[in-house]
């Protein structure tokens, strides 16, 4: 399993648009990809799951991937977080 922790830097946190961007990026991979926030873990391929967390600016989140393309998935999601200005 590969994982990376981020601090959310987007002013509006992870609301509908950024959640959709992350879900689309995660859905390209076969690995199981999860997002953990505040003790809750959701499937990062589920828009409703991600939005249900109510992630605000300054929050610490962990994205984990497990499967045949886990390293590629995590690298792509890290790139998405950075390019979209969502976190670091």
UniProtKB/Swiss-Prot annotation:
Q: GO CC annotation: what is one? A: cytoplasm
Q: Does the keyword Transport apply?
A: yes
Residues with PTM Phosphoserine: 12, 46
Q: Where in the cell is it found?
A: Cytoplasm
- Predominantly, its location class is cytoplasm
Under the heading InterPro entries, the entry gives: HPr, HPr-like, HPr-like_sf, PTS_HPr_His_P_site, PTS_HPr_Ser_P_site
Superkingdom field: Bacteria
Q: Does the keyword Transport apply?
A: yes
What the record says about family reads: Belongs to the HPr family.
Q: What does this protein do?
A: General (non sugar-specific) component of the phosphoenolpyruvate-dependent sugar phosphotransferase system (sugar PTS). This major carbohydrate active-transport system catalyzes the phosphorylation of incoming sugar substrates concomitantly with their translocation across the cell membrane. The phosphoryl group from phosphoenolpyruvate (PEP) is transferred to the phosphoryl carrier protein HPr by enzyme I. Phospho-HPr then transfers it to the PTS EIIA domain.
Q: What is this protein called?
A: Phosphocarrier protein HPr
Q: Which organism is it from?
A: Priestia megaterium
């Amino acid at each position: 399993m590969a994982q990376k922790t981020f601090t959310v830097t987007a002013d509006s946190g992870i609301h509908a648009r950024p959640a959709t961007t992350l879900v689309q990026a995660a859905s390209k991979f076969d690995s199981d990809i999860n997002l953990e926030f505040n003790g809750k873990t959701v499937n990062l391929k589920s828009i409703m799951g991600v939005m249900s967390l109510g992630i605000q600016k300054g929050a610490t989140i962990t994205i984990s991937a497990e499967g045949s393309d886990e390293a590629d998935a995590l690298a792509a999601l890290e790139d998405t977080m950075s390019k979209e200005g969502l976190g670091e």
